[in-house]
Curated annotation (Swiss-Prot):
Composition skew (Polar residues), residue ranges: 488-501
UniProt keyword terms in alphabetical order: Chromosome, DNA-binding, Nucleus, Telomere
Database matches in Gene3D superfamilies: Telomere length regulation protein 2, C-terminal domain
Protein name per the record: Telomere length regulation protein clk-2
GO cellular component, one term: cytoplasm
Function of the protein: DNA damage checkpoint protein required for DNA damage-induced cell cycle arrest and apoptosis, thereby playing a role in genome stability. Regulator of telomere length.
InterPro entries (UniProt xref): TEL2_C_sf (IPR038528), TEL2_Regulation (IPR051970), Telomere_length_regulation_dom (IPR019337)
Organism: Caenorhabditis elegans
Amino acid sequence: MNLRSRLVNATERAVLFQIFKDVQNDPEKYDNAVEAICESIDYFGKFLTDSEYLTQIKPILDTQCPTKSIICFSKCLTKVSTDINTTTFRDVITMLDWLKYVVEKSLTSAICSSLKVKETDVSAVQLYREFASACSNIPEKVSNCCAKALSGEHVKYINTVKWIFKMNLVQGIQKAMLLAHDDIVTAAPFTSFYGSGGPYMKTVAEIISSGRNIDITNKDGLLVQMIEWIGSLNNFDSQWRRMMFLIFQEPTYQGIQVHESLLTTLFLISKSDQILKRCIEATDLTGTLKRVVMVKLPFQRVLKRKTIEILINFVYRTKEQFAIQLLETSVKIWSDLNYAKSAPESQERHIVRMILYLVHLFRTCSSIDWESLFLNSMDGVHCRMSMLPMYVQSGIFVNQALCKQATKHRSKTHGSDEQPPETLEENKFVSSEVGKIWFEEMTSILEHGFNSSTVKDSERVRETANEITKDDSGEEFEETNAQRLQNNKDSAAITSKNNLRLDSDDDEDFPDYQVNESEKIFKNLEIGEEPKNKVTPPAYIADAFEMLLEKEKYEVFEAAFFNITNLINRRPIGFPQIAEKLFIRILHLQNNFGTPKFKETVDEIAVACITQRPEIVPSVVRLIIAPGQGFSIKQRLLHYIHNAADGMGALDKKLEECVMAQQLRIGGPTLSIILHRTINTDYDDEDEDPHRLLVPEWRRMVDARIAANTRRIGTTREPPRAGVVNRLAQAAKYMFYPLLVLPRGENASLLGKDSDLLASLIMVASMVYVRCGVCPQIHRMSSELISYATPHRFSENAKLRTACIIAHLNVTTLLPGDLMDELFDVPALIGWFDWANSVLVNASSSQLEKDMTRQFGHSVTKHLQRYHPAVLQHQDV
């Protein structure tokens, strides 16, 4: 019988202690003891006290291989953190305590022991591959355990375990690299990087490569920490360079894509040429490194100025011919018509900075065909002349810079007397402050490179652009057509009278020209205002979708922009296929033309997309919880979902009139009476109802007499109601359930720094729940909402606690009494009652929290009084 079977079948403490003693005495036989103990902890855990968990298990951990223990903990943490697993939080916290013990004692030594592995030992190589994968996955799996936490203290302890693991991981990698450096120095001879003469560095390289994005601190990841440590090393000799080659330039078993991501991240986080030179020192560009520095970084990313300088300097330092190729490719792409039309402003600035810095580096190089580059750039200038001023300004400047180089090269090769201009002249698009700053930056890059003392910050360009007004018409006043016609009216009449006889060649006088009154009516335009060109609004959603990309003609853009909401509300053919793309495009749409009521219209379009296509809400929720999104954008997206739910759950005005008319014809109660009886349920006596007191006495008497003398057919049956479909209830699986995001894994931050976002999610989910009304799905929706909000009732965040109270209040208010009694048993209701009392007596509770709790407690009390009056005799009501 294996160890796990023995642990599962153990029914007495003595048998269990004997098993632990056998494992401790013969660790080689039970080399998988950690995995067996973790998998069967929910079976034998009931026989051990909290202190025995430590006294009985920790001696076993000391006898086991720490490398295998780390791998086993990584596997078992995945199982115990899921909801379907019956493991209690006591078992989870115990397992985390064991992990913490092993990490503090043996993680550093386990990483260092990987240096002694021989590549010919297949089993050892496979073991340490699994170990590297476990080290990169454990922080995320520890975060998943927060889903089973019962209080804020538990979450803090889980974060402490994760922090201890990260710190020991960094220390272990650094110590292993120091030991490897000493081994390389003493190894003789060191014939190959992975040979028997030197240490085995693949495990360290795999940990750094796969765990490069592990957050060590709030700002820096694992790779950033390692780069800073490498940059601080003294006596960086050839042995260190060999190790850097093994870590950064040799691909691991994880594949080329991971290696490519590692190199890309390395360039993006490098702060200087010296640090990058320590990490990557190459004599040629081949394979993955060539693709990263020649394609991915320069043409698939928008880089900061410092990163552009580091990248180009690296290519220039490695091989000058590749830098020339990079310049030619940049000019070719920049001159392409399709690129010019689709490139945003940030991408345009990025590629212009690259071209100008490359021209700065090669300003004295004669091996470049400057004339060919100049001729290619002419296409880029022509295609930018009808675009925004920044594009025109960049095109003219790049063309002038290449023209200067071509002229200088031509004068040297052909002996021409033509001299290039010493400085580039400002063009007419430099009149604005933004244009001046951009011109100064381009001039500085071309003349001095990326010198921080001379280059203007691009952030300053964006800030200044928002401050500058768009009215640049000047003080000169132009007469409109109507004014010009009025001023010339008298002179034209006098001239016609004086020359009347000269205008006739057949002895007949021409009559005076009379201007019609309709032609005298003109609209006086404001100073600087241009007459608007009318464009027919698009009739198809696909055409409107494409017209939103218009960057030159504002009338085309506005024709689609202001008409697309009407198109969406008609549910056109083809809209389901492009709804999600349209939502994303609208979300990131920029007001390039200064369109009035731009933000309000964007909000209307986004809400219409969700209303007519609720299937996109799961994608919107994924966008909300995605890392890197600003809190304002997340709140904006939640606002869209909330407004769409209001529109889908509300009754249409025309439909409401139709329903009321039908109910009046069939003699049933009107909609207003139904709502009145539903809302005002606190008055047992009809005369005490304040709404009834507003009706005059004579009107009530007349209504009573008419009702007594009116014959109705089928009065014993409930009057039929006109069918009103709640679209929100039908779309609950798209509008409600995706909002219940499980705070685990990548979303574990919802329990910490993003707890405000979790509160907003619960609030919006409860509002959607209320808008769905009493529908067939109300059973499951009520249970899901309560289950989702219950674990956060005692959170440290006041907003999150208030959101949980509101969710419970909405459920108790919306659910009919008999249905609520069926879904929630008496112990659950008593628990709610006690929770409400604890909130009211808590001094740290906010006033809003107490107000909502009073309403919630009143609702629970009324339900107990009606359905379980005996329970209240034992409660302090």
